Structure formats: C-alpha cells, structure tokens
Amino acid sequence: MMNYSKKIMLMLVTASCLLVACGPTPQQKLEEQQRLARELNDSINRLMMTGDSAKIFDALALNDQLLQLDTVRENQFRYYMQRVSMFYQLGRDADAFEIQEKAMVLLPEDNYDRLNYFAIKNEKLGNTEKAEFFFTMALEACDEALEHGAGKDALINKAAILYYQGKKDEAHKVIEDAYLQHQDDEDLKSMATGSGIWDEIEASTQKMKAIKLEQPAKTDSIHKH
C-alpha cells in the first residue's frame, strides 16, 4: 500500500506536469503552489497527531517537500517549528533544539524568542558572556514589547527567561506586579495566585536544561541514529 510520502510525491509530480502542459499564468502557478502547500501541511498534521514514530518519519519527509515548495519567510518559520515539534516527539531533543535555529534566524533580530534561543544556545556551548548578553537583550525586548501593549505572551516570556536563569523570585514578581496593575484580569489573577503557569515554566526549564549540545552540531537528518 502506497504510504503518505509516496502519495504526496505522486500528487506533486502530476500537478507539475499539468502546469507545464497547460501553460498556466503566474497567478495560477501561485494558487496551485498554495493549494499543494496546504495539502502537504494537512497531511503532516494528521501524521503528527498519530504519535506513531513511523508516521512521524513520513511526516518529516513531507516537511522536507513543504520547505522546498513554499519559500515564503513566515511560512518557512512555521514549517521549521513544525519540524522541531516532530523531533521532540521522536525524543531527539538536541536535534530539535539545533533545528530550531533555522526558524529563529527568520525572526527579526530584536525578537525576544530569537534572543532567548541564542542566549540558551551560548550558555550550553559555554559562552557565558555571550549568553548573558543575549539574556539581557531578550529581557529588554520583552520590556519594549510590553510597553507597546504586546500582551501576556511577552509577560510570560519575561518570567520564563528569569526563571530559567534561576531568578525565580524575580520571575514571580513580574507576574504579581502585572496583576496588581490589572486586578480585574482573570488570566493574570490565575497566573499570580495559581501554580499552573509555573508548573509549565518549570517543566519547560528542566527539559531545556537537560539538552546537551555536541560539537560539531548534529545535522538535520530524518534518519534514526
């Protein structure tokens, strides 16, 4: 029985032949490309939801095709993060972390997620001064985003960065101060008085700290080690 990867490949080849034979306009080519990208993405998501390792490897093969087909910057970011998620599902955390860099460099240089990623990476590689520089920049980026009304994402990221650095009291104070300023906000109340968000941050911190990077870095391979 033909697997997902082969089916999608056949679909792509057939569509390409039709495009050449009919001589489509640039707009038609773009629309067909977008349609194929959506179908690939839907197939990948279905395979990922199974949690089955063999199907996730099929999904990675489709993800390769998707990255080649759709080169729009913001879409590439999503596809790389999709790839990162699959490597985490396979238990290959170090590979996932390395691949994440390909997504992070697609973000603006002053993006707090990007800055935090490179802070953690430099810390893991023993580049303490660089790590501290990036952590500081990431926190400043969070502050700037909050000043411009970025919402809770920047707030949670700031708390998570401080927590990762071992500054747990400061992390809690970030949330508590925000709640004191907006006591009618139920989400902030839940974060300030409950443990849910902190359980998530603790789990994320421990997972990230457990990742060990090797030099030279591992390659983005879909083959089992």
Regions flagged by a language model, labelled:
Residues 1-22:
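Sec-dependent bacterial lipoprotein signal peptides
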Residues 35-36, 55, 74-78, 110, ...:
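Structural signature of alpha-solenoid helical repeat junctions
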Residues 77-155:
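Alpha-helical adaptor scaffolds
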Residues 168-225:
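Terminal, low-structured helical/coil segments at or just beyond the last alpha-helical repeat
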